[in-house]
Amino acid sequence: MSESGQEQNRGTNTSPNNAENNNNSNAASGPLNGGAEQTRNITVSIQYSYFTPERLAHLSNISNNDNNENNSAASGSTIANGTGPSFGIGNGGHQPDGALVLSFRDVPASTPQDRLNSFISVAAQLAMERFNRLLNRPKGISKDEFDKLPVLQVSDLPKAEGPLCSICYDEYEDEVDSTKAKRKRDSENEEESEGTKKRKDNEGAPLRTTADNDSNPSITNATVVEPPSIPLTEQQRTLNDEETNPSYKHSPIKLPCGHIFGRECIYKWSRLENSCPLCRQKISESVGVQRAAQQDTDEVAANEAAFERIRRVLYDPTAVNSTNENSSAPSENTSNTTVPTIGNASSGEQMLSRTGFFLVPQNGQPLHNPVRLPPNDSDRNGVNGPSSTTQNPPSNSGGSNNNQSPRWVPIPLTLFQFHSPNPNPSASDSSASPSAANGPNSNNTSSDATDPHHNRLRAVLDHIFNVAQRGTSDTSATTAPGAQTVHNQGRNDSSSSDTTQGSSFLENISRLTGHFTNGSRDNNNDNNHSNDQQRGGSTGENNRNNLFSSGVASYRNQNGDVTTVELRNNNSAAFPPTDENPSQGQGSSSSDTTIHNDVPNDNNEQRSSQ
């Protein structure tokens, strides 16, 4: 998901003479036109796209393209001119699938940048919660609709059904008559209510008697004691549990389609699905309208709560004052980030864009605990990478950052570099990533590529997607001989190896989703074959030697002869003799002659020749 925020100034002086005041954060906070407060209109567009293996592969190809440097420079100039950012995820990406647009009018121009970042974070959280509700909508039926289904007796079951439930294969049992159970519960409630009434009457009479008799305070103290309310609380809790999680017996129940299941089993199924487990016919036709109305009500309530938070962020003066007190410390780390200005702009419209990944939690849990901005300067440098196309929230140093409201921290696309950094210092300027070359600290590309924070980010992502971390070890760590050979081959070979390692993330995504399994295996086989050819076949033979360290191998030829050899870390012993070189098969070890005693016909001639 990508965020694109649009700010339009109203009432500000946009003449070219005041262009030098763009970097002054207090330029728009002063009064204008006789003390009137400056305001602006803010429009935030939350653009979203659906990630598929094909699109992830397309994004990986774009990130590895050498033309990203020119594209990022052109995009940076476009944003500076106020014509808007490029749509899609990353430069040259596809058009977004949709957008959630929020517009707010008459926002005070003196609103600090931290408040605007919080506003964008709340808008992004609103969009993510809406996606959660769309993806995790309940599909089951209510308890009232389930109770309308007819319950059968075991004796009334057709002979074709049998006495077993087709879901759990347990025997059916007759359900207790609901009318009798209801009468029993009503009688118990009446008896309990009568007992409570008698207890209250008995407690009230001594109380009136002892009120006139002041000479015996001990009796008064004994009659003032109130009855315990534990039974009523437990009874109410039991009723609530029975309504939410009712207990049914394994009585046969008939669905509208005619299939019969156990009542307990089909109730658990109906809480999740409104269809028959066998034929997928709907169980209840009126559930869709009721569920849609309930979902609309919940969505309206959630939107109102989010809009109230945004209103407090933008228009509440007390919140603005508290934010100004918390953010009184000056910002120090502004060299690695491009912070959009709040003051007078050279044009009447200013655009800011941020691009990042957001992870949707499982089981539809709400996103109430966003990620906090790291307080350390080193962590901020690791998150806010040097990039001219992605603009992240400003990082204010100091201890006051811990008191600020939590916010989303988008991960820039430029940090998703799964290839190993180029160790050659002479080629660092040309082989470095475009995002690092475009940053203000482009002279330290080699040190940024080997930054431990990048390695830590790579390790976290590898742990999430169960990808073996390759190419991120320190210089002191020991590596395989084959990896050292590829590491020292030069610039041409390093580009191909980087592409192979960069695709591991996409291949694992495809493996998790069940797509392109055969294609990824074929690619891996081709890559291994090409690497073996470049290394003189040493790697393939080493893998064969390490495949089986010891054991016995048997081979049967076309004539029916069986040859058995022992595997003793010898590659030649693992392969059976061929018909073209019969002398090699006859010159096997002594163990072959002892095993071939039971082989008829042709093998006898071989033993005689030996």
Curated annotation (Swiss-Prot):
Gene3D superfamilies for the chain: Zinc/RING finger domain, C3HC4 (zinc finger) (3.30.40.10)
Keywords, comma-separated and alphabetical: Metal-binding, Zinc, Zinc-finger
Pfam annotation, one family: zf-RING_2
GO biological process: nuclear protein quality control by the ubiquitin-proteasome system; positive regulation of proteolysis involved in protein catabolic process; response to misfolded protein; ubiquitin-dependent protein catabolic process
First and last residues of each zinc finger (RING-type): 240-280
Compositionally biased residues, Polar residues: 1-10, 210-223, 319-348, 471-492, 533-554, 592-610
Keyword field contains Zinc: yes
Bias-annotated ranges (Low complexity): 11-36, 384-406, 425-447, 493-502
Location of region: Disordered: 1-36, 176-231, 318-348, 360-453, 471-502, 514-554, 569-610
Biased composition (Basic and acidic residues): 194-203
Superkingdom in the source lineage: Eukaryota
Other comments on record: Present with 172 molecules/cell in log phase SD medium.
Annotated function: Plays a specific role in mating-type regulation of yeast, by acting post-translationally to control the stability or activity of the SIR4 proteins.
Protein name: Protein SAN1
Gene expressing this chain: SAN1
